């Protein structure tokens, strides 16, 4: 099992809106075990979205599916306007 963690620094005042949109995006893409979190400590305006995949190949399939799924693309519309920077990490559960 792999956890996919997408980490964003939202524009000031946009963290709540970004968190809500990431939840919608996860549901639209039928991601497994989607979790959206906002900061209590650390960097300000930090929003994290995590979900599970069985393997790196499943992750790759999801990325290709996302690129061609109109429902997922519609849910993501405008979300890049809500954050300034971000990164993705994949973790293997041991």
Stretch-by-stretch model annotation:
Residues 1-94:
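Short S/T/G/P-rich N-terminal loop/turn motif that feeds into the first structured element of a domain
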């Amino acid at each position: 099992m792999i956890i996919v963690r997408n980490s964003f620094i939202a524009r000031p005042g946009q963290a709540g809106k970004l968190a809500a949109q990431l939840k919608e995006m996860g549901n639209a893409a039928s991601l497994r075990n989607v979790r959206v979190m906002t900061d209590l400590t650390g960097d300000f305006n930090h929003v994290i979205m995590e979900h599970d995949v069985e393997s790196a190949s499943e992750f790759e399939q999801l990325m290709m599916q996302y690129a061609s799924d109109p429902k997922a693309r519609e849910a993501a519309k405008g979300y890049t306007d809500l954050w300034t920077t971000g990164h993705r990490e994949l973790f293997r559960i041991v």
